[in-house]
Amino acid sequence: MNILEEIAVRTRVRIAEEEAAKPLAQLRKEAEALWEKELAQGVNLPLKPLQEEAGESSAKNSAEAGGRPGRYRFYRALQKEGMSYICEVKKASPSKGLIAKEFPYVKIAKEYELAGAAAVSCLTEPYYFKGSDDYLREIAETISIPVLRKDFTVNSYMIYEAKLLGAAAILLICAILDDEQLVEYLKLADSLGLDALVEAHDAEEVERALK
């Protein structure tokens, strides 16, 4: 078992514990209600081609229509002219250990925004990267640029959770997901107004990501 697989296994245990405290049905209801509220307020609507390509008149029907995933805040932020940077807020990593003992995560995110970052990536994995859901929530509430939840998405629970934490996008890693999961999670993210950053490590995974 490599480190990525090890983290994925630990993440499944962690999310099972969270789901025991807050059932999936409840989390899903809250996340869908938040997206409905955003739609009603005209917040974070997808780029126009979404409806045209999906053949639907409503953004929330795009995933069910099987059309191209929506392009929301995170996608749009990276479409600006010139180089676009996704700047990371990370306290630790398995390879480097503790990176920052003092970790003013909100201050770091604000400095990234002031420096011209297109988006911020926030680690929420607590055991190997010393991340926290609270880091993401507070950063998303403070800065105006979109925030990617950088975690090891292993099930739908984490996608609903990301929505409620204020993330604009989720990370999907090809190496820990099969093709069916990739499609399912991309559609689910789209149905909640979330973009997805798909991580691929080799040519085969790139092909899978582009299907």
Regions picked out by a protein language model, each given a short descriptive name:
Residues K101-V120, T142, I159-A168, L182-Y185, ...:
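Alpha/beta enzyme core
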Residues E6, S84-E88, A119, P146-L148, ...:
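Structural preference for beta-strand elements that scaffold enzyme active sites
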Residues Y72, E81, K130-F152, V183-V198:
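Alpha-helix-loop-beta-strand connector modules within alpha/beta enzyme cores
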Residues V89-P104, P146-V154, L197-E199:
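Active-site mouth loops of central-metabolism enzymes
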Residues T124, E138, I145-M158, L164-L165, ...:
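Glycine- and Gly-Pro-enriched alpha-helical subdomains that act as flexible
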Residues N2-G55, A59-A100:
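An N-cap/entry alpha-helix motif that binds or orients negatively charged groups
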Residues E32, P69, S93-I99, A119-E138:
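Glycine-rich, proline-tolerant flexible connector loops at the mouths of alpha/beta enzymes
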Residues R10, K90-A92, E125, F152-T153, ...:
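Active-site beta-loop-alpha junctions enriched in small/polar residues
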